[in-house]
């Protein structure tokens, strides 16, 4: 987290419009974006029921984060805790919390909560390793 975020600024978010970093938020008034977050290009966030992205979270490109599902009607806030990492092309479904310092591998489908300090991946994402706290 050194030089990469040296000049970090809160992005300008307009409803259903791409940010200058090429990601988009629907229902942006329900998005809480932490300090020094990194959201990859072509990521889609639907924050209708709340999305919280805490400090130092990194989200890869082409991810989708949903707080509502029109297919099964499931709704619920999504929380990405401090220093969580979401690999590119991953999907997070409604009501999920990804714990602090956890890492989600690329192309994963996160349907259930992931505890802090874990590595998880797959369809559906499963914890494969617990990380040692430093």
What are the functions of these language-model segments?
Residues 1-73, 77-83, 89-92, 100, ...:
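Domain-scale signature associated with acetyltransferase and cell-envelope carbohydrate enzymes
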Residues 94, 112:
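Conserved coupling/switch loop of ABC ATPases
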């Amino acid at each position: 987290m050194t030089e990469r975020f040296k000049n970090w600024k809160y992005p300008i978010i307009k409803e259903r419009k791409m940010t200058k970093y090429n990601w988009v938020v629907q229902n942006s008034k329900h998005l809480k974006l932490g300090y020094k977050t990194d959201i990859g290009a072509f990521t889609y966030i639907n924050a209708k029921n709340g999305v919280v992205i805490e400090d130092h979270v990194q989200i890869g490109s082409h991810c989708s984060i949903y707080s509502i599902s029109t297919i099964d009607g499931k709704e619920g806030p999504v929380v990405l805790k401090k220093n969580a990492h979401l690999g590119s092309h991953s999907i997070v479904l409604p009501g999920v919390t990804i714990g602090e310092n956890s890492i989600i591998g690329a192309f994963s489908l996160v349907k259930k909560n992931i505890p802090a300090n874990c590595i998880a991946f797959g369809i559906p994402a499963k914890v494969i390793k617990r990380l040692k706290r430093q």
